[in-house]
């Protein structure tokens, strides 16, 4: 009978660790506007007691909810596990490509306007999937 280890070294982690239990999260499209998805994502993480690093990405605002923002994904430190993408669908393929370039391991897209919206949305979805595959980003 085998046992499951209670702790796992980073090199031995499941490929899904970055999505299911991230140690660090970038919020692309973070916002100081309470009506925006990027604000709600930040508030949710904070209120739920997330203990990892949160990196809000917003080139127009110096800080959101007391957390210093970064201007873009290129400014992230190495090793960020997950990106929450809170931007319009048209920007998502390029953002996923940037995640791959920066070594972000996983992404959750919090946007509509993909395959469910017709041919143009389906093309955007295909582009995002291709960018994820090329960059090794799990969606």
What are these regions (language model features)?
Residues 1-138:
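Catalytic-core regions of core metabolic enzymes
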């Amino acid at each position: 009978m085998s046992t499951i280890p209670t702790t796992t070294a980073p090199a031995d982690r499941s490929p899904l660790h970055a999505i299911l239990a991230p140690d660090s999260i970038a919020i692309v499209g973070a916002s100081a506007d309470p009506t925006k998805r990027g604000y709600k994502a930040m508030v949710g993480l904070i209120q739920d007691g997330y203990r990892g690093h949160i990196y809000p990405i917003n080139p127009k605002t110096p800080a959101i909810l007391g957390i210093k923002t970064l201007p873009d994904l290129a400014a992230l430190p190495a090793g960020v596990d997950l990106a929450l993408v809170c931007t319009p669908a048209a920007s998502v393929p390029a953002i996923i490509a940037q995640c791959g370039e920066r070594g972000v391991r996983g992404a959750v897209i919090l946007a509509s306007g993909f395959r469910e919206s017709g041919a143009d949305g389906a093309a955007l979805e295909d582009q995002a999937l291709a960018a994820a595959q090329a960059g090794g980003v799990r969606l």
